Amino acid sequence: MSAQPLARAFRQIGGMTAVSRVLGFVRDVVFAALLGAGPAADAFLVALKLPNMFRRLTAEGAMSNAFVPAFARARREDGEAAAMALAGETQTTLTMVLVALVILGETFMPAVIGLLAPGFADTPDRMNAAITLARVTFPYLPMISLVAFWAAIANADGRFMTAAAMPVIFNILLVGGAFLIPVASGWLAVEKAMPLAAALLMAGLLQMAVMARLLRRTCLMPAWRWPRFAAPVRAMWRQFSVASAGAIALQVNLIVDLSLIHI
């Protein structure tokens, strides 16, 4: 990448990151003012942690680090069709894994919340609220994972602006959902925080729609392909396995930290 496109990419990513950080601060202030401290806040924050933990593994970091070099190499050495075939197989495999993970998570959510926040067992209302909210927010995981996967394809093509705007969409939708909290101010904890959980899913759907539109417009949207695990695909997943080791260790540490906080 020459100096001029590199500078433009830096401005785009840096600008969107700065806007996202400001909106993230606004989001936290609005949460504190409208949701406050209590069972609703505790339950929602634990529910929000769950998809974010898995996202580090399936969306950011390990997956991107493994896929982007493989996609760029296939594009350079074997042509556009081979690169898009790799992307299509990876997309299908990733989606199948994520759907299975969501099904398992939804089924065993009480045990998962008991692991993340063992102290909630002493207050059944808080535990039940966290379980319900986590079941609502957990489907955000495949949404944001596919968004990050599509963003990696766009980035490999030198298109950074839309991908960098994804956190901005997330924060705007969450702030909007927070302003619905006063409507539920007299409700139970789970119902009081439900506007935020719904806003999270809306953010995921909007992020998917925006990224999908970009890829379709630029003819970069991968087709769904049944995985055949050819040599480039196997090499990519081997790289993912290596890269995920560090991410898994980090997430285990975060789970331990979160469990200690909520003892």
Name these PLM-found stretches.
Residues M1-I261:
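Membrane-embedded alpha-helical bundles of multi-pass transporters/translocases
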